[in-house]
Swiss-Prot record:
Membrane topology: Multi-pass membrane protein
Entry's EC annotation: 2.4.1.32
Recorded phenotype for the gene knockout or disruption: Embryonic lethality when homozygous due to defective pollen tube growth and disruption of embryonic development.
Gene: CSLA7
Active site: 158, 311
GO biological process: cell wall organization; embryo development ending in seed dormancy; pollen tube growth
Compartment(s) of residence: Golgi apparatus membrane
Binding site for substrate: 217, 219
UniProt-recorded name of the protein: Glucomannan 4-beta-mannosyltransferase 7
Catalyzed chemical reaction(s): GDP-mannose + (glucomannan)n = GDP + (glucomannan)n+1
Tissue specificity of this protein: Ubiquitous.
Length: 556
């Protein structure tokens, strides 16, 4: 009896003609070989035949279609990057500074009114178990140059660790004794996380006397002149709702991972934020280092925790109300980059999942809005959301980490040189403009960004389809000076599960296999990229990135 009796029940005549039609482009010997393999009792031969059929009918056509799709996305992304580069070049060449387009006058004491001529400003500092950085951030906020009777420092502490909460309270009491108008606010719960804390902070009675609110995360240290540089724009330009400053990183040189993060974020601020501000007066609020007009914030519905990007959510809703934003590139606020890989992964998950989920929830409102021009809607939906928050992540992982390596295994699937090499190189060089002094790290940055693309692709799917950890909010760990002072214990025996990321290792193995296959059977030099990229995935997969901080060394 045949080991595969089901094959003998198939209509052999029909199937034979099908095989012949598939192989008609080949020789008659090939066709006969196909038929003989099908009629054979050898299970290996039949499996091989079925694979050849599936490869010819399904796999290769699918990959060819995906390559075409990726080529289209590559061109779209290149055009987007070129457009942003041209805008920034125009802004730089013609020195189109904010002061040229928005009225700005320095704040001075009125002879008759004195400090009463200054508007009331609320400074909010949300915190959660951040004892390593709370003192420096509170101190920086309390040193802001502004009349003491026209500013309120509001520390919103959601800490669950008694030691952290006590330290924050002591710091607030210390500055209060020095004459600073500072309040220490706590909640019974953490509903809404950061958005919930900010929302509760705005409900206090003393906030009603304030005109503007400046927001700084716990690791941010504004310069004393921060309000003097931002508030005048809001005073003299009633259509402005937000003035955003740029992040500057005090620990950028701490390790390779922080240097690579600095490159990405420098591009975000130098190019993306500046383009949005210069063209459509719209960009995503960065959640910190910015000043809001309180009336605009309230008119837009206040803080909403429907997504994990409450800052971007508020920016979109304010724009739909007709408000404008201003970004000041040379207004730098010191902050800290995540130096542990665990913290970076949590941050990148939130920064990718949140915008995708926000697009899902707000796209309809953007389209229907009557306060936004057609071109601005196009910019918001296409450039801001679709290209930068969706296509960029899909293209990076699917094309460069899955489809391009697969062309080694399927020679029938070809990728033009301009798409495989020239276009990505141009895009990378354009992105590198944001941080020219780090251009020598460009190759490492490309490999690291590709390795991180798997995490971002997963987060993107969660956000778009609202599944899994779509509402997960993990506060990015800040270490302040603890690494320098060695307050974090060195733990030589690290638990394996804390470091290993299985999916990254699987992708690394896939790339390694493709690279070796290309060396043995290939006719190009794609293996050079594949082998280096596989190493990057293995490094990320085994957690050999950044400063390792054991879970027991900081508070969750």
């Amino acid at each position: 009896m045949s080991p595969l009796p089901i094959f003998h029940r198939l209509p052999h005549a029909t199937f034979s003609s099908f095989l012949l039609s598939l192989s008609q482009a080949g020789s008659s010997k090939t066709s006969v070989a196909f038929l003989n393999a099908f009629k054979s009792e050898d299970i290996i031969a039949r499996i091989g035949l079925w694979w050849q059929l599936i490869r010819a009918v399904v796999v290769v056509p699918v990959f060819k279609f995906l390559v075409l799709l990726c080529l289209v996305m590559s061109v779209m992304f290149f055009v987007e990057v070129m457009y942003m580069g041209i805008v920034v070049l125009y802004v730089k060449l013609f020195k189109r500074k904010p002061e040229k387009f928005y009225k700005w006058e320095a704040m001075e004491d009125d002879v008759e009114c004195g400090s009463a001529s200054y508007p009331m400003v609320l400074v909010q500092i949300p915190m959660y178990n951040e004892k390593e950085v709370c003192e420096q951030s509170i101190a920086a906020a309390c040193k802001i140059s502004w009349p003491s009777n026209r500013i309120i420092i509001q520390v919103l502490d959601d800490s669950t660790d008694p030691a952290s909460k006590e330290l924050v309270k002591k710091e607030c009491d210390r500055w209060s004794k020095e004459g600073v108008n500072i309040t220490f606010e706590i909640r019974d719960n953490r509903n809404g996380y950061k958005a919930g804390a900010l929302r509760e902070g705005m409900r206090h009675s003393y906030v009603k006397q304030c005109d503007y609110v400046a927001i700084f995360d716990a690791d941010f240290q504004p310069d004393p002149d921060f309000l003097h540089r931002t508030v005048p724009f809001l005073i003299h330009n009633p259509k402005l709702a937000l003035v955003q400053g740029r992040w500057e990183f005090v620990n950028a040189g701490q390790c390779m991972m922080t240097r690579l993060q600095e490159m990405s974020l420098s591009y975000h601020f130098t190019i993306e934020q500046q383009v949005g501000s210069s063209t459509f007066a719209f960009f995503g609020f960065n959640g910190t280092a910015g000043v809001w007009r309180i009336s605009a914030l309230n008119e837009s519905g206040g803080w909403n925790d429907q997504t994990t990007v409450e800052d971007m959510d508020l920016a979109v809703r304010a724009t739909l109300r007709g408000w404008k934003f201003l970004y000041i590139d040379d207004l730098k606020v010191k902050s800290e980059l995540p130096c542990s890989f665990k913290a970076l992964r949590s941050q990148q998950h939130r920064w990718t999942c949140g915008p995708a989920n926000l697009l899902r929830k707000m796209a309809g409102q953007i389209i229907r809005s009557e306060n936004v021009s057609l071109w601005k809607k196009w910019y918001m939906l296409y450039s801001f959301f679709f290209m930068r928050k969706i296509v960029a992540h899909i293209l990076t992982f699917c094309f460069y980490c899955v489809i391009l390596p697969a062309t080694v295994l399927f020679p029938e699937v070809t990728v033009p040189k301009w798409a495989a090499f020239y276009l990505p190189s141009l895009i990378t060089l354009l992105i590198a403009i944001g941080r020219l002094r780090s251009i020598h790290l460009l190759a490492f940055w490309v490999l690291f960004e590709n390795a991180m693309s798997l995490l971002r692709a997963k987060a993107l799917v969660m956000g778009l389809f609202e599944t899994g950890r779509v509402q997960e909010w993990v506060v990015t760990e800040k270490l302040g000076d603890t690494l320098k002072t060695k307050l974090i214990p060195q733990v030589p025996n690290v638990r394996f599960r804390e470091r290993v990321h299985l999916l990254e290792l699987l992708v690394g193995a896939y790339l390694l296999f493709c690279g070796i296959y290309d060396i043995v059977y290939g006719k190009n030099t794609l293996y050079v990229y594949l082998l280096f990229q596989s190493v990057a995935f293995f490094v990320v997969g085994f957690g050999f990135v950044g400063k390792y901080v054991p879970a027991s060394s900081y508070l969750a």
